[in-house]
Amino acid sequence: MYKRQVTHPSDSPKNLRLQAQLQGWSFPYLYDKNQNFAKDLKAACTPDFYLFSNEGDGDFLLYYHGQLDDSRPGNNIPLSGKDLRSAVKDLNQDNSYPSNQMPSLGCNIKWTPGKEPSWFK
Protein backbone atom coordinates (compact mmCIF):
# COMPACT_ATOMS: atom_id res chain seq x y z
CA MET A 1 0.00 0.00 0.00
CA TYR A 2 1.30 3.44 -0.93
CA LYS A 3 1.50 5.90 1.95
CA ARG A 4 1.66 9.54 0.94
CA GLN A 5 4.86 11.15 2.10
CA VAL A 6 4.24 14.56 3.61
CA THR A 7 7.15 16.72 2.51
CA HIS A 8 5.60 20.15 3.11
CA PRO A 9 3.21 20.02 6.09
CA SER A 10 2.74 23.81 5.91
CA ASP A 11 0.83 23.22 2.64
CA SER A 12 -1.74 20.91 4.25
CA PRO A 13 -5.44 21.79 3.79
CA LYS A 14 -5.68 22.68 7.49
CA ASN A 15 -2.70 25.04 7.36
CA LEU A 16 -3.82 26.57 4.05
CA ARG A 17 -7.27 27.23 5.52
CA LEU A 18 -5.60 28.99 8.47
CA GLN A 19 -3.38 31.00 6.13
CA ALA A 20 -6.43 32.04 4.08
CA GLN A 21 -8.16 33.27 7.24
CA LEU A 22 -5.08 35.15 8.45
CA GLN A 23 -4.51 36.78 5.05
CA GLY A 24 -8.20 37.54 4.46
CA TRP A 25 -8.38 35.57 1.21
CA SER A 26 -11.92 35.50 -0.12
CA PHE A 27 -11.26 33.49 -3.27
CA PRO A 28 -11.71 29.73 -3.56
CA TYR A 29 -8.69 27.49 -3.90
CA LEU A 30 -8.34 23.85 -4.81
CA TYR A 31 -6.61 21.18 -2.77
CA ASP A 32 -5.36 18.74 -5.38
CA LYS A 33 -4.65 15.75 -3.12
CA ASN A 34 -3.39 13.42 -5.85
CA GLN A 35 -1.94 16.24 -7.97
CA ASN A 36 -3.93 15.00 -10.98
CA PHE A 37 -5.42 18.41 -11.77
CA ALA A 38 -1.98 20.05 -11.74
CA LYS A 39 -0.68 17.31 -14.04
CA ASP A 40 -3.65 17.73 -16.41
CA LEU A 41 -2.84 21.45 -16.65
CA LYS A 42 0.88 20.74 -16.98
CA ALA A 43 1.42 23.14 -14.10
CA ALA A 44 4.98 23.85 -13.08
CA CYS A 45 5.01 26.50 -10.37
CA THR A 46 2.95 28.59 -8.00
CA PRO A 47 1.38 30.98 -8.50
CA ASP A 48 0.25 29.94 -11.97
CA PHE A 49 -2.90 31.50 -13.41
CA TYR A 50 -5.39 29.78 -15.72
CA LEU A 51 -8.42 31.52 -17.21
CA PHE A 52 -10.98 29.43 -19.07
CA SER A 53 -13.70 30.56 -21.45
CA ASN A 54 -17.12 28.96 -21.04
CA GLU A 55 -18.21 27.84 -24.48
CA GLY A 56 -21.80 27.42 -23.28
CA ASP A 57 -22.04 23.75 -24.19
CA GLY A 58 -20.33 22.41 -21.09
CA ASP A 59 -16.90 22.90 -22.63
CA PHE A 60 -14.30 25.20 -21.16
CA LEU A 61 -11.33 26.27 -23.26
CA LEU A 62 -8.07 27.55 -21.87
CA TYR A 63 -7.98 31.24 -22.74
CA TYR A 64 -5.05 32.47 -20.63
CA HIS A 65 -2.18 30.75 -18.83
CA GLY A 66 0.48 32.98 -17.39
CA GLN A 67 1.63 35.46 -14.82
CA LEU A 68 -0.44 37.79 -12.67
CA ASP A 69 1.77 40.77 -13.49
CA ASP A 70 5.44 41.79 -13.66
CA SER A 71 5.91 41.98 -9.88
CA ARG A 72 8.42 39.60 -8.35
CA PRO A 73 9.85 39.37 -4.85
CA GLY A 74 12.59 41.98 -4.62
CA ASN A 75 12.01 43.79 -7.94
CA ASN A 76 10.06 46.69 -6.34
CA ILE A 77 7.28 46.49 -8.94
CA PRO A 78 3.96 46.80 -7.09
CA LEU A 79 1.36 44.10 -7.45
CA SER A 80 -1.24 45.15 -10.01
CA GLY A 81 -2.60 41.98 -11.58
CA LYS A 82 -2.43 43.75 -14.95
CA ASP A 83 -1.76 40.67 -17.09
CA LEU A 84 -4.57 38.59 -15.61
CA ARG A 85 -6.93 41.60 -15.47
CA SER A 86 -6.24 42.32 -19.13
CA ALA A 87 -6.99 38.70 -20.05
CA VAL A 88 -10.28 38.80 -18.10
CA LYS A 89 -11.24 42.07 -19.81
CA ASP A 90 -10.39 40.65 -23.25
CA LEU A 91 -12.36 37.49 -22.58
CA ASN A 92 -15.40 39.48 -21.40
CA GLN A 93 -15.21 41.60 -24.55
CA ASP A 94 -14.95 38.50 -26.78
CA ASN A 95 -11.51 39.54 -27.98
CA SER A 96 -9.23 37.01 -29.56
CA TYR A 97 -6.91 34.81 -27.56
CA PRO A 98 -4.17 36.99 -26.02
CA SER A 99 -0.96 36.30 -27.91
CA ASN A 100 1.43 37.84 -25.37
CA GLN A 101 1.21 35.49 -22.40
CA MET A 102 4.17 35.70 -20.05
CA PRO A 103 4.85 32.50 -18.11
CA SER A 104 4.49 32.50 -14.36
CA LEU A 105 7.56 32.57 -12.19
CA GLY A 106 7.53 31.11 -8.71
CA CYS A 107 8.23 28.10 -6.55
CA ASN A 108 8.19 24.71 -8.20
CA ILE A 109 5.26 22.50 -7.37
CA LYS A 110 6.24 20.05 -4.66
CA TRP A 111 5.43 16.79 -6.45
CA THR A 112 4.89 13.62 -4.48
CA PRO A 113 8.23 11.77 -4.54
CA GLY A 114 8.14 9.08 -7.21
CA LYS A 115 5.00 10.59 -8.79
CA GLU A 116 6.62 13.51 -10.62
CA PRO A 117 5.29 14.21 -14.13
CA SER A 118 7.54 13.41 -17.08
CA TRP A 119 8.20 17.09 -17.89
CA PHE A 120 9.55 17.68 -14.38
CA LYS A 121 12.16 14.91 -14.30
Describe each region flagged by the PLM:
Residues 3-22, 36-38:
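Structural microenvironment flanking redox-active thiols in thiol-disulfide oxidoreductases
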Residues 3-4, 28-30:
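Structural recognition of the beta-strand scaffold that forms the well-ordered cores
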Residues 26, 32-116:
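Thiol/selenol-based redox catalytic cores and closely related redox-interacting motifs
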Residues 118-121:
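Glycine-rich phosphate/pyrophosphate-binding loop
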